[in-house]
């Protein structure tokens, strides 16, 4: 329904008639006439969507593995945690004017398809030796003109404390990050410059949040269960093992190439995950119209 609504107003309100799917797993619509902007926001709201924090020096959208929820190598589904973090960060009164934009990525798989090490904060869902679920936390990654791999600041953090810990991470960045030079304002520059001093300050702030503030952002099991219920897999028809399509011999090579590049294992051994490309001849990768 959300995609259909975007396709409809993308056709009626955009002079170019198409949107753009980006590598950060969202959709951009450019060249919206200012006179139509309010109407577009109203249409988005009808399908529970918005454009809040899609730009500016704030916490942007939370990204994750494109195969989240179906990946065969998944330790835990990262989508409920991504949604919980999205709700925490949206309209956060303390983090609406950071030194620079701030991007968080999370993965629950052994293969890092979300490239979390190249984000301001990268989160790996892992299990410790006792089998308890938690996060490995990296901070200060990024690409651009100064590519940096994130620094590990917590080898294991209990899953229910992730918001309290990120509160400390972003708070110290908000306090210490440079605002005098846009090219030196990302958290990767701060972490590289301060090193252990930044890590120690985050840990001290985190302990203050736990002891003095009463750990206000601790995730309860009930809350995790509530959000997880929004990601229940759809009911699918039983897979028939008797139906199989044949491929003409002259197209077998193309099919084998597609099978290798576009098809991945699924956690349900009877299914496969298929990637559909937006790249077409004669147009920019990611551009898509209503058709």
Q: Across the structure, where does each feature detected by a protein language model lie?
A:
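Peripheral terminal and linker regions in Fe-S/redox and tRNA-modifying enzymes
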Residues: 1-291
